[in-house]
Amino acid sequence: MKLSKYAKLVKQSGSLYLCHVEDSGVWLGTRWGFYKANGLPETVDSDTIMTILDFDSKAAEKIVVQERDFETVHDMFGMDLSDDPAPDIEAKKIEVAAVYKGTFATALLCNDGELVFYDEAQLSPLADVFKESDYVQTVVRVDPAGRRYVVIRNGFDTEAGIMPVKIVSKEFLGDLSDFQARCTEQYFREESRAAALAAVQAAEAETGEQATMEGMDE
């Protein structure tokens, strides 16, 4: 886990969660995600973590710090962030992302057909994991209330849990439909232009070829 990347997310969200989990050690979080803090001692407290993250007193004033204790990693704010793969729902990243009214959302298509959107920037603390491992997997889990969230696994280990982003709405679908219609119109415009240009180039090539042959006859 890159603590410098995590610190940037903390500044952006204005929140820092320091979680002591009895069966899993220390986890760090923001409003949008929680990360396994491998290497941090279980005795770390809120003052120490602010020092480790290099937050001065001015920066600290803008950050709400919450230190929480959990009995099990199976229930952290309703999320199961255990290494147990049983709750995993397979999902694959869709190549088309959604950027809407300032929100950038990556979409995952679950194997049951449901879409889950999340902010991929929340994965920045795991940059070293993605770079160094060939076994990173993005899956989806469901909390007791039926809400889905994203889990990042590295082999047999769970590295993070990311909260979903709410982006699909009636207004979004209306704007998306209009955008799709305009893209379709633009596609046919460009196809028509390309066909017209190809016809002109073919005619010019034929004319040039005829002129060359006439010159040879003379």
Q: What kind of feature is each model-predicted range?
A:
Residues 30-33, 39, 50-218:
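C-terminal functional regions that serve as terminal interaction/effector modules
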Residues 2-11, 41-55:
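Short, structured "edge-of-domain" segments at secondary-structure transitions
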Residues 1-37:
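Intrinsically disordered, low-complexity linker/loop segments enriched in Gly/Pro
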